[in-house]
A protein has these predicted regions:
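Conserved alpha/beta-hydrolase catalytic His-Asp/Glu region
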Residues: 1-48, 53
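Short beta->alpha junction loops/turns
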Residues: 2, 6, 68-69, 96
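A broad structural signal for alpha-helix termini and local helix breaks/kinks
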Residues: 4-5, 84, 114
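Conserved loop-alpha-helix segment in the C-terminal half of the alpha/beta-hydrolase fold
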Residues: 56-94
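Catalytic histidine-centered segment of alpha/beta-hydrolase-like enzymes
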Residues: 91-107
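C-terminal alpha-helix
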Residues: 109-113
């Protein structure tokens, strides 16, 4: 797990692994989540439908982006423009899992936002 996310401490990697897998009947292990729904919407929504949904969100919205994430910055790639009242906060030293990579900084951002 640390190979995939070098920001994780050994303790975090162990915790996520222990709580993120199920043991199969044959003794092997499988992730609890379904990799097939990670890339696409589980509801079969098109990109246009997703953008229309974002456009209906009227409450203040905080998009937190780890600067070392594999995902694009929502401001740079245009996703931000679909929201009525959103802002992007970029976090140094964090990948896609900002809440794992920089927990205290993430919590501070969240508290300030709320």
């Amino acid at each position: 797990m640390q190979e995939a996310n070098s920001h994780l401490s050994p303790e975090q990697a162990r915790h996520l692994t222990q709580h993120g897998v199920n043991q199969n009947e044959d003794g092997t292990y499988s992730w609890k989540f379904d990799n097939y729904v990670r890339a696409d919407s589980p509801y079969g929504m098109t990109q246009i439908e997703i953008e229309q949904l974002w456009g209906r969100i009227s409450c203040p919205t905080l998009l937190v982006y780890g600067k070392e994430s594999w995902a694009a910055n929502p401001e740079s790639d245009g996703r931000l423009r679909h929201f009525q009242n959103a802002r992007v906060v970029s976090v140094e030293g964090a990948g896609h899992w900002v809440h794992h990579d920089r927990l205290q900084g993430f919590l501070e951002l969240l508290r300030d936002f709320l």
